[in-house]
């Protein structure tokens, strides 16, 4: 009785779910949701970005990543932190110990500390062992200085956002004037969606998910960053370089991982060749040397032939032949 009751209850809920599904499906077909600016082709996919670190055998372009660090230092660090990266990690980019120490000591934001005499909160110059400090003391201060938007930490940005480095590059170079903006089909945004006007305090960017982003354009003009290596500084170059730097912050062991992967592939290839050679040299020969056993054994076939002769059916077909 209990099983029957449980079965009926299950049937009831299953039927209820099916009914709800068909009702919603019918409503979706008869009254589909209205298109939005994001779904009508005004949101753009990230542009292509070719970096030296791309691909299964990619390696970092140390000069480009150093330029990207310079862009982060002079532009991005005013709002964004790198909590998972230590100053001493910069040695992987080719900086010497003395240069790393100088970078840490001259960093604009000091590291939170405690006054050893009074026990009160204090700050000190950064050391190579310290992680990059946040430019804000807390989340409330960060939101207060950015129109209530919290600037995200950039340590893992290229892994946390779909599109990775191309998304970062496209976002930084994608700010545009909303008035007169058209999609690839030639449709004008504000004519198709008059209510899509960018709210006050936000900035139009077709590469952002909802087209409006709180971050103002960080790269506004060519020459904004003067590269130490003499590379021509343009907005496009700045965006590419800082995207390459953020790939490194997210995957500092990328080159090691690629190297280990290559070694493993070579090992598997050699092991496969050796296994095939062992098969052809040992097992295939051993297989040919195994004597047949059973009805096809030559001795058994000879005995059957003699038995047919003794039975007077010599020359007749083998038993079962033709079946």
Positions of predicted regions on the chain:
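Cytoplasmic C-terminal tails of single-pass
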Residues: 288-323
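The canonical Cys-X-X-Cys-His
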Residues: 72-83, 242, 246
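Electrostatic cytochrome c docking/interface patches
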Residues: 44-70, 81-100, 230, 250-258
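Extended, hydrophilic extramembrane loops/domains of integral membrane proteins
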Residues: 207-251
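Membrane-proximal low-complexity regions enriched in glycine and acidic/polar residues
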Residues: 111-213
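Selective detector of the "anchor" transmembrane alpha-helix that sits immediately C-terminal
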Residues: 258-283
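Acidic/histidine-rich catalytic neighborhood
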Residues: 55, 64, 85-86, 92-93, ...
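Post-cleavage N-terminal segment of exported redox proteins
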Residues: 1-59, 275-293, 297, 301
